[in-house]
Design a protein with these regions (language model features):
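Recognition helix of helix-turn-helix/homeodomain-like DNA-binding domains
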Residues: 28-42
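DNA major-groove recognition helix of helix-turn-helix
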Residues: 37, 54, 65
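Short, basic-rich loop-to-helix N-cap that marks the start of a DNA-contacting helix
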Residues: 39-52
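Short alpha-helical "recognition helix" segments of helix-turn-helix
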Residues: 22-23
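Short, charged recognition helix plus adjacent turn
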Residues: 2, 10, 63-72
Length: 72
């Protein structure tokens, strides 16, 4: 499954939030922040924390991309 967190980082830019300060306020660690930056999977707990902090829905911070074999 390919995931993109580009929406999250655009939202952070739009709100003037720095990644490291955001992670600290949300309560996610540096490893989770690195995974988000690399579009790797993170725990649902982390996703929920982010959404609650930003007062948004899951679809506002991430999207699931079609797998290469799904694109026919």
């Amino acid at each position: 499954m390919d995931i993109s967190y580009n929406k999250l980082f655009k939202l952070l830019i739009d709100r003037g939030l720095k990644k490291t300060e955001f992670a600290k306020q949300v309560g996610i660690g540096g490893n989770t922040l690195a995974k988000l930056s690399k579009n790797e999977t993170v725990s649902m707990d982390s996703v929920v924390r982010i959404c609650r902090y930003l007062k948004c829905d899951v679809g506002d911070i991430m999207e699931i991309l079609p797998a290469d074999d799904d694109q026919q």
